[in-house]
Amino acid sequence: MNAPHLLEKILRGERLSSEEAYALAMSIAKNEIDDVQKAGFLVALRCGRERPEELEGFVRALLDLAVKVGPFREAIDTAGTGGDRANLFNVSTAAAVTLAAMGYKVVKHGNRSVTSAAGSADVMEALGYNLNLPPEKATEVFERTGFVYLFAPLYHPAMKNVAHVRKNLGIRTIFNLAGPLSNPARPGYQLVGVSEPWMLDVFAKALKNLGVERAAVVHGRPGIDEVSPTSTTEVYFVDRDKISYSVIDVEDFGAKPLESLEPLKVRDIKEAKEKFLRALRGEFPEAVFLGVNAAMAIHVIDGKDVSEAYLEVVETLARGEAINKLREIIEASGGNPTF
């Protein structure tokens, strides 16, 4: 790869093919170009807004470099880009645990916080989950419980070669977009939240090209990377090689809209843990937020109507099955529940 030539191409306003993006991501991750060039590429790609082919190429590279586990094609991952600055509790992870309690297979892939008060890994660790699961143990936990949480730094060791560049830049880069799509277990189903509306189309096309079975890419009002519990949510559905667009209202789930996101916000890991547990116990208003997101995931997996799925989620929470599943998952990981 000719780094200066490729950088000039981007600066001329041209974009990279998926093959060029793959080669670039590989060169960055393998330290084949220096830090100045790495920063130049990341900023240049960001300036023109990343394209589906570029995102696809970076994701393919990350997956090829990742520590192998699975694949678990029957599973779903629920993830988001982050960066919405809303500081809401970790609803996608709470929804993932609830899905497992309902019998759905889940492989959650996540990391510590970058922009929020607490990342999914921070919360899982605070709850007692053992993050340090090698592939063999992760497979065992998945087969035993139907759920496993994969701590991204363990499975993407090559990312350490760009970590300091990303930190020093202090801005979102294409790696922030590629992360939610780079689950090393390669689940066939995905619910992905994006922080900006323009990302909807980009993610949907990338997911289609990556060969996902079914997925939903969501952006909720007022600007969150989750299904909104207060208003409407834009959704791009991916069904193998087809992409469709819709807008769904919280009332379509059979839920009463929350008046505000304020009760869902957290300031630190302690609050994040408390609201996470309240959601799994079916307490208001956290359970509404969990419910609409879990229902959307169920719709992705089996096409069930979101109102029917929402009711099933609410009943699961009321029976205490989600909180019990969380204990089971933590114990299977070799951890000790802290609640």
From Swiss-Prot:
Pathway membership, UniProt: Amino-acid biosynthesis; L-tryptophan biosynthesis; L-tryptophan from chorismate: step 2/5
Superkingdom of this protein's organism: Archaea
Cofactor: binding comment: Binds 2 magnesium ions per monomer.
GO molecular function: anthranilate phosphoribosyltransferase activity; magnesium ion binding
Keyword Transmembrane among UniProt keywords: no
One BP annotation, GO: L-tryptophan biosynthetic process
Catalysed reaction, written as an equation: N-(5-phospho-beta-D-ribosyl)anthranilate + diphosphate = 5-phospho-alpha-D-ribose 1-diphosphate + anthranilate
Cofactor annotation: Mg(2+)
Ligand binding (Mg(2+) 1): 92, 226
UniProt: anthranilate 2 binding residues: 166
Binding residues annotated for 5-phospho-alpha-D-ribose 1-diphosphate, in chain numbering: 80, 83-84, 90-93, 108-116, 120
Pfam families hit by this protein: Glycos_trans_3N, Glycos_transf_3
Binding site for anthranilate 1: 80, 111
Coiled-coil regions listed in the entry: none
List of residues binding Mg(2+) 2: 225-226
Entries under InterPro entries matching the protein: Anthranilate_Pribosyl_Tfrase, Glycosyl_Trfase_fam3, Glycosyl_Trfase_fam3_N_dom, Glycosyl_Trfase_fam3_N_dom_sf, Nuc_phospho_transferase
EC number, UniProt record: 2.4.2.18
UniProt entry keywords in alphabetical sequence: Amino-acid biosynthesis, Aromatic amino acid biosynthesis, Glycosyltransferase, Magnesium, Metal-binding, Transferase, Tryptophan biosynthesis
GO cellular component, one term: cytosol
Family annotation (NCBIfam families): trpD
Function: Catalyzes the transfer of the phosphoribosyl group of 5-phosphorylribose-1-pyrophosphate (PRPP) to anthranilate to yield N-(5'-phosphoribosyl)-anthranilate (PRA).
Family: Belongs to the anthranilate phosphoribosyltransferase family.
Oligomeric and partner information: Homodimer.
Full protein name: Anthranilate phosphoribosyltransferase
Organism: Ignicoccus hospitalis (strain KIN4/I / DSM 18386 / JCM 14125)
Lineage, top ranks: Archaea, Thermoproteota, Thermoprotei, Desulfurococcales, Desulfurococcaceae
Gene coding for it: trpD
